[in-house]
Amino acid sequence: MKGLAELKNKIVKAPHLNIFKIGTWVTMGLFATFLLVYIFVGDEMLNYYPLLILFAFGTPFISLMISKATVKRAYNIRMIGDGGASTEKEKLVVDTVTLLSQKLDLQKFPEIGVYPSNDINAFATGASKNSAMVAVSQGLLNSMNETEIIGVLAHEMSHVVNGDMLTSSILEGFVSAFGVIATLPFLMGENNNRGRRAASSMATYYMVRNVANIFGKIVSSAYSRRREYGADKLAAEITDPSYMKSALLRLQEISEGRISLQNSDREFASFKITNNFSMGNIFGNLFASHPSLAKRIAAIERMEKTTKK
């Protein structure tokens, strides 16, 4: 196993999640949220707004806490860690995730699984970097070689060590809270009025809600794309840029139809190494959870040129 043998000899500087920085942003965000509540609604609804905002923040974190159990059922994932690997490529997956976990100083190694799908993809999920799970599709194992598989796994492990699942949930909480702040005054106006004023207030509520949803989707998608670039970069650093580039080129072949896909699933697309449903136009790219493969490959090629200097 040339690829894995090279990885064993590579010195890796493990990144560390800056909890203080995350806590600072959360505190500032909460302060800004309640300030907006006071500006827009005054004292009238402050009594129950905190509870509603807490619910808006709490929902993404509850989803994060149960994410492993949810995806295990949704994807019919077969766990292959602790001697469960039955093929050479499954053993490669286990060995690679184990080795990367050691090099990245994880206190607890991720659970490792394979799911039955022709979709050539992989994803990471879990409430924290020490309670994570990495899963790959059978289609990926059937279609990629050793270095490509290592590149994909390094990308997913980068999500784990960067705490991307947690930061994504924090962002979703802020987006949900923004939706509550933006729409609830209009909904309360509908309840407090009658006739034409009520109809007008309800129409305004739906309009503002849709605008808030679109804005939230744009913000979360922009962060997701930035997160993917970061995972690509770290994956290239802890393995080799050629590994990540090779994996992305293979995915590009798939996206261009040179390799057929079946049974693709939109659910959990934002957690995967690529999103097969991204649109090519400017409007579509605004809502894409992943950058285009061409842009990701170009970013890796720039890294290659830098490292060769």
Curated annotation (Swiss-Prot):
Cofactor binding comment, as recorded: Binds 1 zinc ion per subunit.
- Positions that bind Zn(2+): 155, 159, 228
Q: What is the uppermost EC class here?
A: hydrolase
Please list the cofactors this protein needs: Zn(2+)
Active site at: 156
EC number of the protein:
3.4.24.-
State where the protein is found: Cell inner membrane
The keyword Iron-sulfur is assigned to this record: no
Disulphide bonds annotated for this chain are none
InterPro entries per the record? HtpX_protease (IPR050083), Peptidase_M48 (IPR001915)
Q: How does it sit in the membrane?
A: Multi-pass membrane protein
Q: What does the UniProt keyword field contain?
A: Cell inner membrane, Cell membrane, Hydrolase, Membrane, Metal-binding, Metalloprotease, Protease, Transmembrane, Transmembrane helix, Zinc
Q: Read off the PROSITE patterns from this record.
A: ZINC_PROTEASE
For this chain's UniProt record, which GO biological process terms are given?
proteolysis
Highest taxon in the source lineage: Bacteria
Q: Where are the transmembrane segments?
A: 22-42, 46-66
Q: Name one GO cellular component term.
A: plasma membrane
* Gene Ontology molecular function: any one: metalloendopeptidase activity
Q: What family does the Swiss-Prot or TrEMBL record give for this protein? A: Belongs to the peptidase M48B family.
Listed name of the protein = Protease HtpX homolog
Whichever gene encodes this chain, its name is htpX
